[in-house]
Amino acid sequence: MADHATLIDEANLETAAPGPAALETASAPLVRGKWLKNDMPRERLIEQGASVLSDTELIVLILGSGLPGHDVFDVARTLLDRFGSLRAMLDATYTDFADLRGIGPAKKTQLLAIMEMARRSLVDKMRMRSLINSPEAVENYLRLRIGGRPQEIFVSLFLDARHRLIRCEESAQGTLTRMAVYPREIVRRALSLNAASLIVAHNHPSGAVQPSASDCRLTHTLRDALTLIDVQLVDHLVIGTDSVYSFARAGWP
């Protein structure tokens, strides 16, 4: 079993241009002072459901109002422009909101609390089901957890004998294009958690999901190392902006 780190390097991949900032998805106009009652976000949510609202409108309902002199819709748009998407906002910390004008500490912490609730609800759902039979749930969770991160993150999902989640951990962090992953440490962690199987994943901040040569080397090294302790590597997922690459579905190239 090798001691050295496997370096994941995305630099040799063709990078995709970052997607545009989140756009309005609902048809109602967001023009200050020109709202009809039936176009108000709160009324539309009550009458039609939350799914009809745009990302901006959802944030507006959470914020309620801006500070004096700051329109709440402008604040919501600024948030989306800064992070690019609601998904990317899930990874925000209080520091990321520190210089944001228009909302105070109470609203900033409220936003962070709601985002954390979304993450935890996904983890709870995964703990109650066999992840072997729920690949979509795993991919959705990983998109939310690491899909919008500006640096490469390597995540390990340790599973029990019934393929239920024991723990999800960030095993390594890197830069925009590379990171060092130590297979030996992941194997040790699998042993300490008495895991029967494992799903690993990492993101490509460029948005492209095609695995690099180093991604393939790491996958084979980790798979061989886990086989020695009778732990199955179920899959290695590469998380991009809008898609996911599965080594298992691709036949473990």
Swiss-Prot record:
Q: Which InterPro entries match?
A: MPN, RadC_JAB, RuvA_2-like, UPF0758, UPF0758_CS, UPF0758_N
Kindly list the biological process annotations in GO that this record carries. proteolysis
Q: Position of motif JAMM motif?
A: 202-215
Q: Which family does it belong to?
A: Belongs to the UPF0758 family.
Per UniProt, the keywords (alphabetical) are: Hydrolase, Metal-binding, Metalloprotease, Protease, Zinc
Q: Which amino acids does the record list as binding Zn(2+)?
A: H202, H204, D215
- Lineage of this protein's species? Bacteria, Pseudomonadati, Pseudomonadota, Betaproteobacteria, Burkholderiales
Q: What is this protein called?
A: UPF0758 protein Bxeno_A3578
Q: Which PANTHER family match?
A: DNA REPAIR PROTEIN RADC (PTHR30471), UPF0758 PROTEIN YEES-RELATED (PTHR30471:SF3)
Which residue intervals define the domain MPN in the entry? 131-253
Entry GO MF terms: metal ion binding; metallopeptidase activity
